[in-house]
Amino acid sequence: MEIPDNSDQLSSFEFGKAFPLMSGSFSRRTFFAGALVATPLARCLNAIIPEVIKESRTQAAFELRKQTALAQSKRPMASMTSNGDENSFPNRIACFAKGLPQNRFGEVEPAAYNALLAAIKSGKHADFERIPRSGGRKLNNPQAAYTFHLEGGDPHTFDIPPAPSITSEAAQPETSELYWQALCRDVPFLSYETSPIVRQAARNLGATPSSVFRGPTKGDLAGPYISQFLLKPVRYGAYTIDQRYSMPVPGTDFMTTLNEWSPIQSGIPPWREASYDLMPRYIRNGRDLAEYVHYDFPYQAFLGAALILINSGPRSILNCNQFRSGSNPYRYSTVEEGFVTFGQAEVTDWLGRVTTAALKAAYYQKWMVHRRLRPEALGGLIHQTKASIRKYPIHSSLLESEAVDAIFHRYSSYLLPQAYPEGCPLHPSYPAGHATIAGACSVVLKACFDSSMLLPSCVEPSADGLTLVVRSDYSPTVGDEIDKLAFNIAMGRDWAGIHYRSDSVAGLRLGEDVGISVLQDLACTYTEDFKGFSFKRFSGTEVHITPQGEVVQSGGPRHRA
């Protein structure tokens, strides 16, 4: 059965839909054209001009902030619609509860879960401190769901659709995919066409060996599985980072027995750790990709991509290299070059900015709306139902999955093998945080660099990951590789067994929405001859953000001034 591309079903707010044209005496042009410098010249010009400039500049800055805030305030609040699993099962077996007191079957104590709900409802720090814990691990920042953000839309105004219910047939393909990924973790991407287990997985999932476990974009489906931005060296100032990493040895899987799985659900740290290969390797298989997104800092991969592109020209400044965006006003300047604006300082700063904004929106959805259980917990429900230990309302198509039976054949249990000793982090599954960051950072990279440019060469790791092999038959564009990088980072967490595909797809689209909203505000701040940002979303939709913060999407009207 083919894994559905959920991206077309993920409705997102049309940016600026509710934003009226700015009216009144102030506009962006009057801010900087001198219309506000209307203070009477009652004193000597030399004495009054600095004061006039100071006053008008302050007023201009205030009006700009006020108008962008007013525009963003007209965004509707998110719908807060979940899949209903929390209310369907009074014992909360379909909800995230890791780290709370549980019995040996992984069923949360009702009082503990109710305390979590009470804290989420109140938003008070004291109520969060009253949530019972049973292990050494702490909940991951549920109070962040209430945090405000001063650029772009408020975190509570971004919407995503409900996740599939554990009782629905829609849960079967993406859960089966996770079981197949666990079985294929150690197969080199270079060997997919000839691997029996990959061919079996592809056939079962309705894919081909060359397309299985990939994202849906044109960039994802062409060329090597791993993006060039995760393979090529990164110039980090005066230091060059070689992208070979210490990787776990093959077959290093966790939580394949109830004795190991059960205490970890209660938040008890794992009693064993992964064993690592002494030889650094490039990312050559699913396990390596899962390891990369295990210890990365939030926007590491996208900062690396930016540095690769920034340092690919004749000079290491963004506007002087071949990959700078056509909208960069300094591209054709004979006098100025960008740095603070439209340069290296700006793009690297923006990646961090949109990351924080994206995480706030994701954590609002995770904690306040969906509270979706993690795949490792669903694996526990599947195992106990299949083994007749307990009976849970899992859809029959999932219980009869070929992938689940294949896992039992290898591990003698139906649990979902985890790549990380500790399993998932202690926050709910939907949407994926890594994916949300990836979506937001992709918007920044596409806005700042020319997506149509071809990268100078293409490489892929050898089967052992020790070297890079040149692919002379494939010339990727910058945009295609940004898309591939985003899905690599999102799917890396799926390879670990800690997220579902729908978590990743929803996160990527949510991140795009957040990133666009931030650029709407930032686009209004320039005095350069700037025509706006233009790029394509993952769906292929063309987006243009004007200098007035309007968003024009292909096939749609112009929104917000």
Task: Label each PLM-derived region with a short phrase.
Residues 2, 10-20, 24, 28, ...:
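Hydrophobic alpha-helical bundle signature of multipass membrane enzymes
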